[in-house]
From Swiss-Prot:
Protein name stated in the entry: Trans-enoyl reductase tenC
Record's note on what induces expression: Expression is positively regulated by the cluster-specific transcription factor tenR and is induced during cocultures with the natural competitor fungus Metarhizium robertsii.
Highest rank taxon of the organism: Eukaryota
Primary enzyme class: oxidoreductase
Subunit structure comment from the entry: Monomer.
Binding site for NADP(+): 51-54, 219-222, 237, 284-285, 373-374
Native organism taxonomy: Eukaryota, Fungi, Dikarya, Ascomycota, Pezizomycotina
Record-linked SMART domains: PKS_ER
Binding site for substrate: 142-149, 304-308
SUPFAM superfamilies: GroES-like (SSF50129), NAD(P)-binding Rossmann-fold domains (SSF51735)
UniProt keyword list: NADP, Nucleotide-binding, Oxidoreductase
Amino acid sequence: MAAISARPLTQKALKVASPDTLHLVADAPVPTLDQDDSVLIRVVCVAINPVDGKSAELSPTPGATSGTDFAGIVVALHGDAKSRTETADTIKTGDRVMGFVFGNNPHVLGNGAFAEYVTLPRRFLWRVPDHMSLEAAASLPVGIASVGMALHYLHISMSSLLQAVSRSIAAASASQHHDGAFDSDANVFILVYGGGTSTGAIAIQILKAAGFHPITCCSSESASRAKRLGAAATFDYQSATCGRDIRDYTNDSLTLAIDCLSESASMAICYEAIGSAGGRYVSLDPFPVRGCVRRSIVPDWICSFTQFGQSIPWAPPYNLDERPDDHRLAEEWYHLAQKLLDAELIEAPTLEIRSGGLLHVPEGVAAVKLGQIKRRKLVYHISEEALP
């Protein structure tokens, strides 16, 4: 396997050229292994996320490599990482891994998923389980990270999640029936608005494994899959009584909601669905302030890039200071999520796989931005070469 000194010096990469424009560069520097646990990965597949197009349009950083989600093969480790004692859980050269990176990053222009190589700290990578393809793996990282961050912002502790997930894994390994009901969480509903989205589907599965009762708003086309993944009930977001129906179903007990669409209409339904005692609402994007119509509900929103321990120097409202708690939480969450992946408790979304490499990725970014990709995740092969 390639040593650090043998890695190539240049690579192909998609760079932000101007607002809403990505340009393929043939001789971009390969990112360096600066941190003591840095890992260099040969990118095999990437997935397209809404943030890829949104950030390039609203807060472009000319010269920065774009892209978030990827899966690939570890080709090199920082010297300090190589010298550490290896365990069964240690990521090493030759491993298949997946992760997401802060693309379009003003702090680090040369690191993004839309490239032949990417680097990340080892603690922010997941090993791809043997049962999972690299195409499927590329579709999951930012969704898994976002769900973990959302649960943190809902004030659900990692220790309680770990205990519940461990019971789910034990039940699954013993081929026992698992109904999702564990101890104090047995009657706790959590609303996932957008159960047909990739992140919403991941949230349903994780909440089910953690012993909650996930319920979801989604389209009628997405309802059957949401139920198969673990939703206790589905509600059609187009119904004029959607919010009231959820409140009736939960007997006015709903206190927690994750909004994967983060629009005025989705926020309104979440606010109507949350019971009279109030609760917490977390969106995956900045929410419209005019939607805060109930003082008993505490709203917040997440930006998963805060997990890396840096500020986010994008244009408002995405200009965020460092959030040390998010960074600490992420390290715990990655360990827990690896257990879920290994136990086959997280299923990848339906995929649309395209070839053509980096040259055609901007077409996919535009398609996602225009809403042309629905109920599936767009994945591109970056490297068609079989790696050792």
